Amino acid sequence: MVYWIIIMSTFVLDQLTKARAEKFFVDSPVNLLGGILSLTYVQNRGGAFSILEGKRRFFIIVSIILILFLCYMIFKSTSNLYKFSFSLIVGGAIGNLFDRIVKGYVVDFIDIKVIPVFNLADFFITGGVLLLTFLILKEGGEELFLKKKP
């Protein structure tokens, strides 16, 4: 149950921040931290780093498959940390999928200058992938499906 709350919370937070970006940053970006960080509005019609721009249908199909697979992994995994990492990825993926279906593009707005502009969904996906990678490297993936001891 808690993992579905994490998924919904990340989705809602992502959508709320994107709505604010659309309202306030379209014509007037905000520079913060001496210009190191900017809040600006960007329509991303590709994937991460704007790769495969214009391949909307591809990203929708891949996102749906990934979301379904990771929801299955949440259900099957016995490790709370794995479930948490999957939940972050799913919540972020749903946020970007929603944008692609409803708007035809993903709203990005966080600009740190040294990396491409991104959004909170991307942040959650990246955090979930980093945690998952760390867990697999640390544990070898054994914790994914081990049965809990009675």
Curated annotation (Swiss-Prot):
Q: Where are the transmembrane segments?
A: 58-78, 85-107, 117-137
Q: Which InterPro entries match?
A: Peptidase_A8
**Protein location:** Cell membrane
Pathway where this protein functions: Protein modification; lipoprotein biosynthesis (signal peptide cleavage)
Question: What EC numbers are recorded for this enzyme?
Answer: 3.4.23.36
Note the NCBIfam families from the entry: lspA
Family listed? Belongs to the peptidase A8 family.
The name on file for this protein is Lipoprotein signal peptidase
Q: Give the species this sequence originates from.
A: Caldicellulosiruptor bescii (strain ATCC BAA-1888 / DSM 6725 / KCTC 15123 / Z-1320) (Anaerocellum thermophilum)
